[in-house]
Swiss-Prot record:
Compositionally biased intervals (Low complexity): 187-210, 273-286
Classification via PANTHER family: PUMILIO HOMOLOGY DOMAIN FAMILY MEMBER 4, RNA BINDING PROTEIN PUMILIO-RELATED
Leader sequence residues: none
Keywords: Repeat
GO molecular function, one term: mRNA binding
Residues passing through the membrane, by range: none
Taxonomic source organism: Schizosaccharomyces pombe (strain 972 / ATCC 24843)
Annotated spans, Disordered: 180-210, 273-322, 656-681
One Pfam family, short name: PUF_NOP9
Name of this protein: Pumilio domain-containing protein C6G9.14
Length: 681
C-alpha cells in the first residue's frame, strides 16, 4: 500500500467530490479551496466499491468497501459514464470500474465521431451522441444524460441551478470534473446558483446513492441487479422510489416544459420540440422491491436518412446542435429538418437568454438560410419584448431583425411597439432598439415606431438610456418623421433643457432640424433665457443657439440680459453665456454689453472675481479699438490692487500681450522688483 493510499480520503461519492459551486456567497479563498480538494485516490480502500450503496463521507473520509454488495450499477457523470466497480487505470485515457471503464469525453474534436461501446459483465454503455454544438464540444466516448427539469446542486448548499443553460461549465472545469467521478444528477432543488452539480443526499436517505440514468425512462429497459447488503430490504425500496421519481422528471438535455427535447433531429438546431415522449417506462415496484436496479440501455444503429449524426430516436443522449454545414446539399437537408420542428414555451426563452445559446442562434442566422431565419423568428417572436431587454437576448434580436424579411420586420416592430418605451429605458433594450431604428426602411415601420414613442418623448429625453433612442431617431429619420420630437420638446422646453440628458437632445435637435423647426425651437426656448442662462445644463442650450450665429436669435437672447450683465458675469454658468454673447453679438449690442462691464464702481470687483475676469478678458479681445482703449485706461489704476491675485495676474498678462504700453515697470513683475522683493524678504 502506497503512502498516498494510507492517507484519509473522502468517499468518491461524497459531497467533497461534487462539482464546486462558484457563488458570490463564497469568498475567493473558499472558491479556490474547492478547486484544491484532494484528488481521488482509487487505492484508499482494499475492496472494490460497488455503485449500489456507498456511504457518505465519514470523519476519516474512507469508503467502506465491505458493505458494498451490489455488484453493478450505472452512473452518468457530466463528462463521462461509469459502470461497475471502480478502480483507477494507470493510463490517462480513463478510469476503470471493476471490469468496466469510465472514459472522459473527447472535447477537442471538431466533428462527431462514434466510438465502440464499453461493456461489462453487468451493464452496457451506449456510444456517444454529441454534435459540434455551442462550443464545438463533440464526440463523447459515452453518452451524456442530463435532466432538463432537474437541478444540479451541491449537497448541503442553498445554491442550485434550475436549468443546465445556467450551468456555465467551461473548459477550465474539465480537470476538476475528471478527478471527481462522483458526479450524477438528482431531483430538482431550489433555483439560485449559477453553477452546481453534486452527489445528492435525498434519495432513500442514502447520501452516496448514484441516481438512475435520467434518460432511462425513455430509452432503457430495467434489469434486475444482484442481491443487496444486509439492510437492502428497507433502503433499496426507498432508493428505487427515488429512481422512479427521477425518471419522471428526466430526459435528454435540453427539455421543454413538457419534458420533450427541443434540439431536433440530425443534431441541427431543432428550434423544435422532439415528437418523442419521455414518459416513464415500465419499472414496477415488484421489480425493484429488494434490489437496486441499474438501467440497461437499448440502442439501434443510426438511421440511414440522417445527415452526419444519428437522430435522437436512434441514440439516447445529450444532443448539442452542430454547426450548419456550408455544403448546399447538406444545408438543404438540414433546413428542411429545422423548419419542420418547433420550440415551445419557456425553454426557447431560456435558450435565447443563455450566452452560448444566443451565440449559436446568431451564427445560425448569419448563414442567411431563409428556412432557419423563418424557424427562429416563428419560435422567438412571442418573446421579442422580453429578449430585447435581456443581456444576451438583445443581441439575438438585433441579428434577427438584420436578417429578417420586410414582412417579418414589420411584424417584429408591431409586436414590440406596445413595450417600446420600457425597452428604451433598459440598458440592453436601448441598444437593440437603436439597431432596429438603424435598419427600418418602410414608412409603415417608421410610423409604428413614431406612434409608440410619441406619448413619452419628454420622459425618454430625460432618461439615461431613452435619450439615445430619441437621438437615433433624429439621426436616422427624416425631418418630417421627427416632427413629433420637436413638438414634444416645445411643449415643455424648460423642463427638457434644464435636464442633464435633455439638454443634449435639444442640441441634437438643432443639428438635424429644418429652418422651420429651428425657428420653432428658438421661439419656445428664448422666453426662458434668463432661467436657462443660470442653469447648469440650460446654459449649454443657450450657447448652442448663440453659436448658430443668427443675428435675430442672438439679439432675442441678449435682450433678456441687458442691464444684468454684471450680475450674470459673476456666476459660474451664466458667465460662459456672457462670453458667447460678447463674441457673437452684433457691434451695436456688443458695445452695450461691454459698457456695462466698464462701470468704474463695479470694475474692481469684476477684475477680482473668479468668473467675471474671464468675461473682462473676452471683452478686451472683442471690443472695438475705441472701446478697448477706454477699458484699458480704466484698468490701469487698478493694477496695484489686483497684481497679486490669480484673477488680476491673468488680466495683466493679457494686457502685456495685447497692450504693451499699459505695462508699468514698478508694478508688473520686473527684474528690479523681483530683486527688491527678495532682498526685503
Amino acid at each position: 500500500m502506497t503512502e498516498q493510499s494510507s492517507k484519509s480520503h473522502p468517499s468518491f461519492m461524497s459531497t467533497e467530490y461534487s462539482l464546486p459551486v462558484f457563488s458570490s456567497q463564497y469568498s475567493d479563498i473558499e472558491n479556490k479551496d474547492v478547486l484544491k480538494s484532494n484528488s481521488w485516490d482509487p487505492y484508499a480502500a482494499n475492496a472494490p466499491i460497488a455503485l449500489s450503496e456507498i456511504p457518505s463521507s465519514s470523519k476519516s473520509g474512507k469508503t467502506n468497501g465491505s458493505k458494498a454488495a451490489v455488484e453493478s450499477g450505472l452512473a452518468s457523470g457530466a463528462f463521462g459514464n461509469r459502470t461497475g466497480n471502480m478502480n483507477r487505470n494507470t493510463s490517462m485515457s480513463g478510469y476503470t470500474f471493476g471490469s468496466s471503464n469510465f472514459v472522459p469525453y473527447n472535447l477537442l474534436s471538431n466533428t462527431p465521431s462514434f466510438t465502440t461501446s464499453h461493456s461489462s459483465s453487468t451493464t452496457f454503455v451506449p456510444p456517444a451522441t454529441m454534435g459540434g454544438g455551442l462550443n464545438n464540444l463533440s464526440s463523447p466516448s459515452s453518452s451524456l444524460y442530463l435532466p432538463g427539469s432537474a437541478s444540479y446542486q451541491r449537497s448541503n448548499s442553498k445554491n442550485s441551478s434550475a436549468s443546465i443553460l445556467q450551468m456555465n461549465t467551461t473548459l477550465d472545469d474539465i480537470p476538476i470534473l475528471l478527478r471527481r467521478p462522483g458526479l450524477s444528477s438528482y431531483t430538482p432543488g431550489p433555483s439560485t446558483s449559477r453553477r452546481s452539480i453534486s452527489s445528492s443526499s435525498n434519495l432513500g436517505g442514502n447520501p452516496g446513492l448514484i441516481a438512475n440514468n435520467p434518460s432511462a425512462s425513455k430509452n432503457f429497459a430495467f434489469t434486475s441487479g444482484s442481491s443487496s447488503t444486509n439492510n437492502s430490504t428497507t433502503s433499496s425500496s426507498s432508493m428505487a422510489n427515488g429512481l422512479q421519481s427521477i425518471s419522471k422528471h428526466s430526459a435528454a438535455f435540453p427539455l421543454l416544459s413538457n419534458a420533450t427535447s427541443f434540439f431536433g433531429e440530425n443534431l441541427t438546431p431543432s428550434l423544435a420540440a422532439s415528437t418523442a415522449s419521455t414518459g416513464s417506462t415500465d419499472s414496477s415496484g415488484s421489480n425493484i422491491a429488494n434490489t437496486l436496479i441499474a438501467p440497461t440501455p437499448t440502442i439501434s444503429p443510426p438511421s440511414a436518412n440522417t445527415v452526419g449524426n444519428p437522430s435522437p430516436a436512434d441514440t439516447p443522449g445529450f444532443n448539442v446542435p452542430s454547426l450548419i454545414s456550408d455544403d448546399p446539399s447538406v444545408s438543404s437537408s438540414l433546413s428542411s429538418s429545422v423548419a419542420s420542428l418547433s420550440l415551445q414555451n419557456s425553454n426557447i426563452l431560456s435558450f435565447c437568454k443563455d450566452q452560448h445559446g444566443c451565440r449559436y442562434l446568431q451564427r445560425l442566422l448569419e448563414k442567411k438560410n431563409q428556412s432557419h431565419i423563418d424557424a427562429v423568428f416563428a419560435e422567438t417572436h412571442p418573446y421579442l419584448a422580453v429578449l430585447m431587454v435581456d443581456a444576451f437576448g438583445n443581441y439575438l434580436c438585433q441579428k434577427l431583425f438584420e436578417h429578417a424579411s420586410e414582412a417579418q420586420r414589420s411584424t417584429f416592430i408591431q409586436i414590440i411597439a406596445p413595450k417600446l418605451v420600457p425597452i428604451s429605458f433598459n440598458m440592453h433594450g436601448t441598444r437593440a432598439l437603436q439597431k432596429i431604428i438603424d435598419l427600418v426602411s418602410s414608412p409603415d415601420q417608421i410610423s409604428c415606431i413614431v406612434n409608440a414613442l410619441r406619448p413619452n418623448v419628454v420622459l425618454l429625453t430625460k432618461d439615461l438610456n431613452g435619450n439615445h433612442v430619441i437621438q437615433k431617431c433624429l439621426n436616422k429619420f427624416s425631418q418630417e418623421d421627427c416632427q413629433f420630437i420637436f413638438d414634444a420638446i416645445c411643449e415643455d422646453p424648460l423642463d427638457v433643457s434644464t435636464h442633464r440628458h435633455g439638454c443634449c437632445v435639444v442640441q441634437r435637435c438643432f443639428d438635424h432640424a429644418s429652418p422651420a423647426q429651428i425657428e420653432q425651437l428658438v421661439e419656445h426656448i428664448v422666453p426662458h433665457a434668463l432661467t436657462l442662462v443660470q442653469d447648469a445644463f440650460g446654459n449649454y442650450v443657450l450657447q448652442y443657439v448663440l453659436e448658430l450665429n443668427n443675428p435675430n436669435h442672438t439679439e432675442a437672447i441678449i435682450s433678456y440680459f441687458l442691464y444684468k450683465v454684471r450680475a450674470l458675469s459673476t456666476q459660474k454658468f451664466s458667465s460662459n453665456v456672457m462670453e458667447k454673447c460678447i463674441f457673437f453679438a452684433p457691434a451695436a449690442i456688443k458695445e452695450k454689453l461691454i459698457s456695462e462691464l466698464m462701470d468704474e464702481k463695479h470694475l474692481p470687483k469684476l477684475l477680482r472675481d473668479s468668473f467675471a475676469n474671464y468675461v473682462i478678458q473676452t471683452a478686451l479681445d472683442n471690443a472695438s479699438v475705441k472701446q478697448r482703449a477706454e477699458l484699458v485706461e480704466r484698468i490701469k489704476p487698478l493694477i496695484p490692487s489686483i497684481k497679486n491675485t490669480p484673477c488680476g495676474r491673468r488680466i495683466l498678462s493679457k494686457l502685456e500681450r495685447r497692450h504693451p504700453s499699459s505695462k508699468e515697470k514698478p508694478i508688473v513683475y520686473s527684474n528690479s522688483e523681483r530683486v527688491n522683493t527678495s532682498s526685503s524678504a
